Amino acid sequence: MIRPILACQDPYEAGRAFQSAGWTLDFSQPPESGDPLVGVSLYGSALLLGVTEGYVSEVELPFLGCGVVLYLTVPDAALEAIHESHRAFRPAEIKTQPWGDRAFEVTVAGWRLMIAGNSPEE
C-alpha cells in the first residue's frame, strides 16, 4: 500500500476542501501538535495532507503538484455522484479513456486527480 503525503500550504484548509467534495476526514492532528497532518480518503484511497515547510522551497511553491496526477478508483455505480460532489472544483466531464476506464479529472487543493470507476471484479 502506498499513502502519499501531499505538501500543502495549509493542510487543514486542504482537508476542508477535500471534505467539501465528499471525502472522509480520517484524522486531523491538532495544529499545536507540531505535526500538522491531515488524512482524507475516498472509497479506500487515502491521502495524507502535510506541510510545505521543510519540503518545498519558496520558489517552488507556485509549482506544487506540477506534473503529478493521482489516479484512484471508485465503484462504477458511484462515479456520477462523486463527479457531482466535486462540482465546486470544476471537474472535467466523465469520459471513457483510451484504455477503457470511465474517468474524470479534477484539481482539489492544488493537486490533480483522475477519478475512475471500476467494476466489482477489478
What are these regions (language model features)?
Residues 7-47:
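Core segments of cupin and vicinal oxygen chelate
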Residues 32, 53, 119-120:
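A generic structural motif
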Residues 26, 34, 54-60:
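A short, acidic/glycine-rich surface segment
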Residues 1-10, 38-41, 57-122:
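Vicinal oxygen chelate
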Residues 28-30, 67, 95:
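Short beta-strand
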Residues 16-20, 81-87:
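Short amphipathic alpha-helices in soluble, non-transmembrane regions
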